[in-house]
Amino acid sequence: MFSPKIIILSTGSELTSGRSQDTNSSWIANELFGIGFTVSKLVVLPDDPEAILEELRTLVSLATKKNPVLLIMTGGLGPTEDDYTLEVVCKLKGVSSVESVVARQRIEAFYKLRGKNFQESLQTAIRQISVPKDSTILNNEVGIAPGFIVSLGENAHLGCMPGVPGEMTEMFREEFSTWILKKYSTRELHSGFRFIWWMSESQFQKEFISKEESVTSEKVIWGVAAKRGYIRVSFQSNERALVDFLLKKLDEIYGPKSTLDVFEELPKLLIEKKITVGTAESCTGGLISKIFTDKPGSSTYFYGGVISYDNGVKEGILGVKKNTLKEFGAVSMETAKEMAEGALVALGVDYSISVTGIAGPGGGTPQKKVGLVYFGIGQKNEKTETHEHYFPFPRSSFREFAAHTGIYLLYNRLKRLA
């Protein structure tokens, strides 16, 4: 089987009008890269059935035996009148739709749980539990509407998933990626990655890629993606030893700044060590707490957070001294330290993260510029760590840089103590 030409299509007039951003395509492309596939093209289409149908026909016409095509489409599987995916695919295939038994059971349970009559809402619900005849069903373990995969001739396939990110990501990881590997993978491909903290793509290119000959050999596929506060470096090769060599190189050169996925690894550490954590946030406005609580099961280790935007909250709830605020200011190493220590007491946790900074665009001074931020990492009965960073970026980016850095700093402390 030849490797397919993969094209990702995102549908939704909210995307083509600019009201929403297409995050699904980049996520899928990154997941595909991790299992050995690259994307040829990204397409965004409005909720226009004729436009969608025309685009699909054009893309399917590109498929040949030596160049098969895999189309991955998200969106348009909901209950509303502008959800056209099922209708378009059935028309493209020349087939009728049929109910998914599993999806029907899920939606009946959904209605029963909420005390609603399924039969009264059947016409609306039926759109969400139907798939094209003779399709491979992708079960939806998070929402209602199933996804599906259809054959469009001998050399083309189309996979459709919901546009809701939480539903799509679960469906892709649990079912669609497995189907792709079984269908198209012809060789074992090894991969690995690292996060490199506070590093730009260009800096990494200069420091590592240009100097490491094995990276630029034909045996390695590498990629770098810039995130808020870090870059994600990935390698793929048929040779496991080569991937391991490059990852070890990164760890040797960048030390503790080279990590696994901190946002996945930190919760594991907290659960494994039975550690509780809380936050004291000023400039990030609760974003660190959001990162924690985005993870299912976070209540086992995350107790809560204090958004101490006002100095009165810093004093009244966190116990920051009035003299500290007067002498050093709200944005200072000293205040970050007392915020972290106050959070330990106020929340009754083992560890705490505090952050205070100047998000801008105003509020800066020659001594304390916009982008300056201080962190405290508190530990019960131990000395509090403090850190200073400078992120001279727009307000929303600054907040993400700061929140991600706070998560990293706690992770780093726990790893050092392990």
UniProtKB/Swiss-Prot annotation:
Pfam families: CinA, MoCF_biosynth. It comes from the Bacteria. Coiled coil: none annotated. NCBIfam families: PncC_domain (TIGR00199). It comes from Leptospira interrogans serogroup Icterohaemorrhagiae serovar Lai (strain 56601). Gene3D superfamilies: CinA-like (3.90.950.20), MoaB/Mog-like domain (3.40.980.10). PANTHER family: NICOTINAMIDE-NUCLEOTIDE AMIDOHYDROLASE PNCC, NMN AMIDOHYDROLASE-LIKE PROTEIN YFAY. HAMAP family: CinA_B. SUPFAM superfamilies: CinA-like (SSF142433), Molybdenum cofactor biosynthesis proteins (SSF53218). SMART domains: MoCF_biosynth. This is CinA-like protein. Belongs to the CinA family.
